[in-house]
Regions:
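Ribonuclease/tRNase effector modules and their secretory precursors
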Residues: 1-97
Length: 97
C-alpha cells in the first residue's frame, strides 16, 4: 500500500494532535481496524475514517481518501489523532479476547 500526504498539513496535525502521518500509516496494517465511509465530510471527495492500532498499543483515528494516479492507487492521509475512550471501546469490542 502506498501513502501520500501534505507535509504542511502533517506538521499542523503533529502540533494539534501529536500524531505524525507516518505513525498513522501503520494503522492500515491492523487486521482488526474498522474502516467507515464518512458521508458527512465527502462533499468534494470520498473520505474514510479508519480506527485501529498503530505501533505499540496506540489506537488512532485516521481520516483518509483514495487517489488514483495512472492506475496506481494511493492512500492520502488527511488527519490523524488518538482515539477517544468511546472510539477505543468500539475498537476493542471488535478484537478477539
Amino acid at each position: 500500500m502506498k501513502f501520500e500526504w501534505d507535509r504542511k498539513k502533517e506538521n499542523i496535525n503533529i502540533k494539534k494532535h501529536g500524531v505524525s502521518f507516518e505513525q498513522a500509516s501503520y494503522v492500515f496494517a491492523d487486521p482488526f481496524a474498522l474502516n467507515s465511509y464518512d458521508e458527512a465530510h465527502s462533499d468534494t471527495e470520498e473520505r474514510w475514517v479508519l480506527l485501529g492500532k498503530s505501533l505499540g498499543k496506540t489506537i488512532l483515528l485516521v481520516v483518509h481518501t483514495f487517489r488514483d494516479y495512472d492506475g496506481k492507487e494511493f492512500v492520502r492521509i488527511i488527519s490523524a489523532r488518538t482515539a477517544t475512550k468511546k472510539e477505543e471501546k468500539v475498537y476493542k469490542e471488535r478484537c478477539p479476547k
